[in-house]
Each structure stands twice: as C-alpha cells, then as structure tokens.
Amino acid sequence: MSNIKVGQFPSTRLRRLRMKDFSRRMISENNLSTNDLIWPIFVCEGNNIADEIKSMPGVFRYSIDNILKELENVINLKIPAVALFPQIDNSLKDENGSQAVDENNLICRSIKTIKQNFPDIGVICDVALDP
C-alpha cells in the first residue's frame, strides 16, 4: 500500500474578505432590493371588485377602481413597477387577437387610469388573449 500525502493546506483558512460585515456587503455578488421587484395585479371588468383567486390564496383580482388602492401600497413599498394580468371574457377572444388593438379594452383602460394617477410607476402588461 502506498501512503497518500495530504495537501499542504493550512489548518485555518483566513477568510479576510468575509471577516467584517462591511467587506461582505462590498464583495457580495447579489443584492436584492425593492428596486428589483415587480408587483403583479390581476384585473377584471366591473366596479368595486376585489375577488380572491381561489387557486392563489391571499391574491385578489381587482376592478380598475380598486387597482388604485392597491397601487398606493405598491408606491409605499417603493416597488418601481407593476405587471397587469387582465381577465378577458372568452367571447371577446378571436383568432386575430382583435382585442389587443382595441384602445378601449380592459388592459388599455387600466393603464390609462394608472398613469393618470401614478405617472412614474412602470407598467408591464399582457393582453391575455390566450385560449
């Protein structure tokens, strides 16, 4: 049998870059803040609606008038953008996706209302015309 030689590593590894909190923060690769977040908002037709989505407990689908109340929370949390997910009636969906170019569709009305009240927030959206 041959003797296996162990490497010449020190018994103590001096991790000088991890010793102090300030240096750990300076060299960390990833930092997550509210600036990195996008708040999802589910939108539906109607007035004064806040219906819980059964498959996502604690998550609600809001009518346009109630979106503004939700956006106040988003602004207070300093989240820079929202993503809108509309609930489009199946009768409005067609093979050409004509709802996508209708300036009075649910998503366009939602964006107009949001931008009139919160012009600085970013809005990401989906016309939700999938079958």
Regions found by a protein language model. Give the residues of each.
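N-terminal small/glycine-rich loop or linker at the start of catalytic domains
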Residues: 32-59, 124-131
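Glycine-rich, proline-tolerant flexible connector loops at the mouths of alpha/beta enzymes
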Residues: 50-64, 78-105
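Alpha-helix-loop-beta-strand connector modules within alpha/beta enzyme cores
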Residues: 93-125
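Generic detector of short, locally flexible boundary/turn motifs and exposed helical patches
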Residues: 2-8, 46-49, 88-90
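Short, well-ordered coil/turn segments that N-cap beta-strands
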Residues: 34-37, 77-81, 118-121
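N-terminal amphipathic/basic leader segments beginning at the initiator methionine
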Residues: 1-28
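Non-catalytic positions within long, well-ordered alpha-helices that form the structural scaffold/packing
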Residues: 72-75
